[in-house]
């Protein structure tokens, strides 16, 4: 990321178009120091903590609430194909993250990578656009976990699902009229906001304490997943799981558009294997820890997702998941699976475990994303206040509190309306740039110190690029989300140029 506090890269490389190799190599060193000296952060995260932080970020409430959406998109249990292809895409993308994270173990992840790969000029601009889109997408991602938590609590207390106020806010988007955004207020909204506030309070501690607590959260996440998987497998019906409707795999236009929509949702659920990259300055022996954490977390979560979805589809008719049998099954599918097998009390226990899982994801998201504004501020590419570090806990406390506050506000939104737009924005302004970037960096700086080199190069980034492009263009009405992403790009570009002109920076100065 552009500014992880490495001023020598920004200054010494201006006239070359690329950072000097000596500066880049320093990023790949497996420093043993307990403190990342130019950032004031403590390297206190080992491999177990890194894996648990990645996994609780990846799983969250997503697979428990999006399974019906994938089944609806693909019109049957062939939805498992979306999860399989999603796992392949996550693995290819994860290998790219592993190489970049091991070579540049700094706070902020993608911000640092884009800044370094594309040089002090284009890199500074692209990394600013990344920060700009993250200002929207990060709080929305965190808020989605909070809303999902409140949704599952509604299985225990249905009053939480009441809506006292709703409003449809049309957001103008050039060429596609409007992007609908639903604002909802009810008891569940307050619960979602409280979830975000509690997570921020628990993160307001040193990184060693935060990592230890993440291990405890990981145990609850595994409990929720295994409870549903084992229940489904013990009450499994092959006819339900593999009762494909006629023409399920006919290679028609409907099949490919449904697969694109399903793959988009699966990609959303696999997000998070890169969480440890945002915490690179706080990882011990990052050249080994970061790649291992990514590979292990992607592999374990892929297996869990496939088992979870197969077991659910083998116990509940897929027609129920598409809305033909009421909202309770769709909104609380994991709890319903266990309730039908072992009774109401067992279902309530699983609902609480899913709530635990949702909170774990919010905890991990807040932790990782709070390091990105901090990294940008260190590089003088964001508000300087976010560069502050708590004098005792050694954490970027201002960035953490800001992100938590904005996320609480976004809890009033019905976030399902924006999931597709958020995925498209991330693909255009982060994932595709990194897939291309890892190949650019191989060509421009072949001597760069790479503690981990992605396997089967260049196949993983090429497969990931193909998968992301398929998600972008295969779905009906895809132009709406793409134009929305372009609006984000245009507004970010205007702000960047205004700042650059005032500061006499590129393209208006040195």
Regions found by a protein language model. Give the residues of each.
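Membrane-interface "cap" regions at the ends of multi-pass membrane proteins
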Residues: 16-77, 91, 95, 106, ...
């Amino acid at each position: 990321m552009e500014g992880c506090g490495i001023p020598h890269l920004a200054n010494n490389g201006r006239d070359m178009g690329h950072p000097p190799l000596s500066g880049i190599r320093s990023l790949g060193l497996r420093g043993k120091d307990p403190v990342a000296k130019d950032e004031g952060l403590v390297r206190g995260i080992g491999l177990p903590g890194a894996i648990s932080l990645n996994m609780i970020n990846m799983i969250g409430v997503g697979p428990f609430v999006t399974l019906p959406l994938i089944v609806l998109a693909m019109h049957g249990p062939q939805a498992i194909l979306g999860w399989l292809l999603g796992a392949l895409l996550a693995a290819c993308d994860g290998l790219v993250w592993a190489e970049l994270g091991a070579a540049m173990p700094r706070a902020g992840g993608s911000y640092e990578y884009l800044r370094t790969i594309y040089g002090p000029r284009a890199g500074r601009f692209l990394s600013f656009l990344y920060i700009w889109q993250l200002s929207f997408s990060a709080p929305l991602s965190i808020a989605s976990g909070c809303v999902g938590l409140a949704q599952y609590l509604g299985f225990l207390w249905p009053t939480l699902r009441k809506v006292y106020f709703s409003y449809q806010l049309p957001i103008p988007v050039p060429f596609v009229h409007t992007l609908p955004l639903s604002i909802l207020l009810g008891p569940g909204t307050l619960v979602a906001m409280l979830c975000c506030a509690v997570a921020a309070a628990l993160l307001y501690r040193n990184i060693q304490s935060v990592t230890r607590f993440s291990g405890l959260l990981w145990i609850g996440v595994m409990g929720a997943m295994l409870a549903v998987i084992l229940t489904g497998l013990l009450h499994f019906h092959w006819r339900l799981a593999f009762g494909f409707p006629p023409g399920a795999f006919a290679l028609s236009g409907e099949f490919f558009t449904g697969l694109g929509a399903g793959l988009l949702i699966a990609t959303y659920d696999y997000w998070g294997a890169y969480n440890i990259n945002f915490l690179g300055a706080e990882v011990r022996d990052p050249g080994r820890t970061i790649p291992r954490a990514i590979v292990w977390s992607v592999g374990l979560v892929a297996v869990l997702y496939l088992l979870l979805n197969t077991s659910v589809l083998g116990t509940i008719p897929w027609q129920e998941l598409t809305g033909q049998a009421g909202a309770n099954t769709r909104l609380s599918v994991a709890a319903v699976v266990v309730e039908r097998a072992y009774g109401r009390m067992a279902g309530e226990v699983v609902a609480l475990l899913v709530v635990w899982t949702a909170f774990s994801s919010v905890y991990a998201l807040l932790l990782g994303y709070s390091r990105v504004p901090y990294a940008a501020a260190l590089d003088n590419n964001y508000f300087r206040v976010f560069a502050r570090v708590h004098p005792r806990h050694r954490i970027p406390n201002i960035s953490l509190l800001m992100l938590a506050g904005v996320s609480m506000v976004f809890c009033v939104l019905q976030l399902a309306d924006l999931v597709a737009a958020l995925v498209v924005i991330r693909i255009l302004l982060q994932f595709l740039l990194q897939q291309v970037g890892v190949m650019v960096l191989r060509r421009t700086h072949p001597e760069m110190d790479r503690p981990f080199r992605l396997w089967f190069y260049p196949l993983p980034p090429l497969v990931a690029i193909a998968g992301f492009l398929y998600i972008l263009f295969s779905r009906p009405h895809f132009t709406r989300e793409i134009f929305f992403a372009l609006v984000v790009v245009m507004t970010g570009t205007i702000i960047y140029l205004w700042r650059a002109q005032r500061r006499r920076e590129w393209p208006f100065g040195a």
